[in-house]
Amino acid sequence: MICVSVQEKSFGDCRAILESCEMAELRADLCRLSVEEVERLVEIRPNLIATCRIANSSEAFAREQLEAAIRRGARYVDIEIEAPDEHLEYIRTLAREYGCRLIVSFHDFEGTPSLDELKGIARLCRTKGADLVKIVTTARN
């Protein structure tokens, strides 16, 4: 299965992509959709990962977008490991209540940590309540 990252600016473009794929990551922080539009997109493709990075938006905006996706039936929600604990706790609790699986993710756009560091990161993600751990690193050679 291929997961498509949806980052389009218009609802219509997002909808067209979601209707043509098996699974998608809806980047609400990059799409800038209304809550109602997020809800409608989740109805089209519930088998998606709802993502809204605080670094690209605000905690309040991220909470609003993720809450809408979870309540409407998104299968997964992705929270970055650096998110404030109270934000992560709120989203984790809501996700559990609605049967949504929590992905806690780590990103390193500069390189790849050592294997021991990666194992430690995975453990930390699990202690934060992750159902799934996502680690993204950057290869340099």
Identify the meaning behind each predicted range.
Residues 41-42, 69, 95, 125:
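A generic structural signal for well-ordered alpha-helical segments
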Residues 1-63, 71:
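Conserved N-terminal beta1-alpha1 strand-loop-helix module at the mouth
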Residues 20-22, 63-79, 119-134:
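Structural recognition of alpha->loop->beta junctions
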Residues 83-141:
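Catalytic alpha/beta core domains of metabolic enzymes, predominantly
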Residues 1-3, 23-25, 47-51, 75-78, ...:
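Structural preference for beta-strand elements that scaffold enzyme active sites
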Residues 28-30, 81, 137:
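Residues that line or immediately flank small-molecule/substrate-binding pockets and catalytic motifs
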Residues 14-15, 38, 66, 88, ...:
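Generic hydrophobic/aromatic pocket-lining and core-packing "Φ" positions
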Residues 57-64, 113-119:
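Glycine-rich, charge-decorated loop segments at or immediately adjacent to ligand/cofactor-binding or catalytic sites
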